[in-house]
C-alpha cells in the first residue's frame, strides 16, 4: 500500500536522523510527473522554482509541495496535455497526475511521530 510506504519512509527518516545534527536541501527543479528515480520520465510540469533549505525535513517537504501547488504548469508534458487550457495555480498537481496517491498522509504521519512540523515560514533570499 502506498500509504504504508509513506509511513515507512517517515519512520526510516526519523531513525536515521535521531539525535544527529541535520540540515536538508531541496532543489525544486525539473519537477517531473513521475518519480525522478525512474529510468524514464516526461518533461517538467512547472518552471524551476529554486532551492529550499531547512533544519526541519517535514517543514521543507511541505513548503516545497506548496510551492509546486501554487506554481503554473508549463506546456509539453503529461499534465499540460490533460489540462490544456488551465494554468493550475493552487491545484494539487501531484494528485492530478496520480489520483490514487495521498502524499499528505506521509507528511501528517511524519509530524505525528515527531520527525518535524508541517508549519513553516518561507523566507526568500
Task: Spell out what each predicted region is.
Residues 3-125:
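Extended, low-polarity segments enriched in aliphatic/aromatic residues
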Amino acid at each position: 500500500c502506498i500509504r504504508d510506504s509513506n509511513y515507512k519512509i517517515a519512520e526510516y527518516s526519523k531513525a536515521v536522523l535521531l539525535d544527529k545534527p541535520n540540515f536538508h536541501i531541496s532543489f525544486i527543479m525539473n519537477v517531473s510527473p513521475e518519480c525522478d528515480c525512474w529510468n524514464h520520465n516526461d518533461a517538467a510540469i512547472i518552471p524551476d522554482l529554486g532551492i529550499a533549505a531547512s533544519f526541519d525535513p517535514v517543514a521543507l517537504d511541505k513548503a516545497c509541495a506548496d510551492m509546486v501547488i501554487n506554481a503554473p504548469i508549463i506546456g509539453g508534458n503529461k499534465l499540460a496535455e490533460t489540462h490544456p487550457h488551465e494554468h493550475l495555480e493552487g491545484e494539487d498537481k501531484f494528485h492530478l497526475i496520480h489520483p490514487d496517491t495521498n502524499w499528505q498522509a506521509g507528511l501528517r504521519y511524519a509530524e505525528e511521530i515527531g520527525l518535524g512540523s508541517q508549519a513553516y515560514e518561507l523566507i526568500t533570499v
